[in-house]
Amino acid sequence: PNMYNINSAMEGRQYIYGLMGFDMHGKTAGIIGTGKIAKILIHILKGFGMNVLAYDLYPDYNFARQEQIVYTSLDELYHNSDIISLHCPLTEETKYLINDYSISKMKDGVMIINTGRGQLIHTNALIEGLKNKKIGSAGLDVYEEESEYFYEDQSDKIIDDDTLARLLSFNNVIVTSHQAFFTREALANIASTTLQNIKDFMNHKPLENEVKA
């Protein structure tokens, strides 16, 4: 379903054209990166009756046994997944992980979700995949050049980024402004973790969330 049709339904125009979806039950989700957020997502997807394939450089096999998921290669994940969701960090190895070549290995009509980092996806390759129907739909909470457009009201401005404008023109693409984290609970957790990190640093304790360069 696209946002135009959803808005039309809310305004009382109750037609079903363009609202055809698919059952998640029995479908296969491919999860790339299995950190904390991905593990919560996997638990939810299993509740919908989905099969889950996962890829991570450091597989958590105890978690895999608990949730009855399978760690596999990227090629196998691309080939067998109906939905692919990205949760890996952005590194030199993962930059443009989703590109023309990897998309060519995917199922026809695959759904791609990115709530990680914009540069995990080569945007022009994504657009080509959408144009030729290889990609059936996409949900993007991040975009390569998001700092120019996200977090501010752009409704009265002309988007001069032709790539973003093209993405927004597809009725099977939803772009949100890097707000997947934006809940009361998440903000409280961020504040609590930040304060604890400061406290640990001041008391010369090990820093649980330290990122080393």
Model-flagged regions — what are they?
Residues P1-T28, I40-H43:
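Phosphate-binding beta-alpha-beta segment of Rossmann-like dinucleotide-binding domains, i.e.
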Residues G109, G118-A213:
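Rossmann-like dinucleotide-binding domain for NAD(H)/NADP(H)
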Residues D82, C88-L90, G116-R117, Y143-E144:
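Short glycine-/small-residue-rich Rossmann-like dinucleotide-binding loops
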Residues T34-G35:
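Glycine-rich Rossmann-fold phosphate-binding loop(s) that bind the pyrophosphate
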